[in-house]
Amino acid sequence: MSSAVVPADDILEPTLQNILDQKSLRWIFVGGKGGVGKTTTSCSLAIQLAKVRKSVLLISTDPAHNLSDAFGQKFGKEARLIDGFDNLSAMEIDPSASMQDLMAAGGDQAEDMGFGLGGMMQDLAFSIPGVDEAMSFAEVLKQVKSLSYEVIVFDTAPTGHTLRFLQFPTVLEKGLAKLSQLSSQFGPMLNSVLGARGGLPGGQNLDDVLSKMESLRETISEVNTQFKNADLTTFVCVCIAEFLSLYETERMIQELTSYHIDTHAIVVNQLLFPGKDSTCDQCKARRKMQKKYLNEIEELYEDFNVVRMPLLVEEVRGKEKLERFSDMLVHPYQPPQE
């Protein structure tokens, strides 16, 4: 465990060491409001995990794709090793990409997922709200599962997109269940119509397609179950000590709880620690405001590991700076005396 001294009143350790120690974790999501240091935190956590795990994959699901900027290295849809590491890889994907893009890029792989539906069935499938994005998410999960990494860290999009991203498995399950119900009611008629029009691509019939979709539903159901298992999945909230960020964090934690997704760690970034002899009035005023919201965080989340990270004088970009920042996730920053 960390060398930090834990107070005698059993306040939880102000580090992410417990996440590193939890060897059963398979999925780790890092999320928060835009501009709070979410990508820096996810990169830093992945670096720490790479010290204790055989293989780590860092995935950006944020359309802004800041991983490339953080490490100074270009990443894309295929996982590639991060320079200077032999067990830490990264990739940048967009789970909200249209299914048309996926089908154009996926070829046979898309067929295997059950996407060879033909125009009519595509229209039927995508008439269900959220299924377009959920199918894209399914493709992402299939890629990730096939890569066999020991632990996967998701650098998620800003708060609203994060929560929608985590709903995808449930949305897809409901959508496929609805399609299955429709097929049982209208299957014979649809088969007749499709037969008259030359059938589905590859000589498939409707039953073949629905069988593939049922297989897909089972895969998504399995992942959904894993997401709700605290031994396998956790969510790290990132915020700053300001009202709007704290409000977003509380809303996010409530929603995560409603999805039965574990969350027990909060990283508070960009904290000011002016020395007692500081002549910076703005720094002192901001520190006073931050202390107010830090106190609220400690009261609201007394059963969370709350990590306090300082505002640095330089951007945290590049391997060396990220490694220094990541060290403070497990060895708490010691501020000067105020």
UniProtKB/Swiss-Prot annotation:
SUPFAM superfamilies: P-loop containing nucleoside triphosphate hydrolases
Record's keyword annotation contains Transport: yes
Enzyme Commission number(s): 3.6.-.-
Keywords: ATP-binding, Cytoplasm, Endoplasmic reticulum, Hydrolase, Metal-binding, Nucleotide-binding, Transport, Zinc
UniProt: ATP binding residues: 33-40, 242, 269
Compartment list: Cytoplasm; Endoplasmic reticulum
Catalytic residues (UniProt): 62
Pfam families: ArsA_ATPase
GO CC annotations on file: GET complex
Listed GO biological process terms: cellular response to oxidative stress; pheromone-dependent signal transduction involved in conjugation with cellular fusion; post-translational protein targeting to endoplasmic reticulum membrane; response to heat; response to metal ion; retrograde vesicle-mediated transport, Golgi to endoplasmic reticulum; tail-anchored membrane protein insertion into ER membrane
GO molecular function terms attached to this record: ATP binding; ATP hydrolysis activity; guanyl-nucleotide exchange factor activity; identical protein binding; metal ion binding; protein folding chaperone; unfolded protein binding
Oligomer status and interactors: Homodimer.
Described purpose of this protein according to its UniProt entry: ATPase required for the post-translational delivery of tail-anchored (TA) proteins to the endoplasmic reticulum. Recognizes and selectively binds the transmembrane domain of TA proteins in the cytosol. This complex then targets to the endoplasmic reticulum by membrane-bound receptors, where the tail-anchored protein is released for insertion. This process is regulated by ATP binding and hydrolysis. ATP binding drives the homodimer towards the closed dimer state, facilitating recognition of newly synthesized TA membrane proteins. ATP hydrolysis is required for insertion.
Protein name: ATPase GET3
Native organism: Uncinocarpus reesii (strain UAMH 1704)
Gene name, Swiss-Prot/TrEMBL: GET3
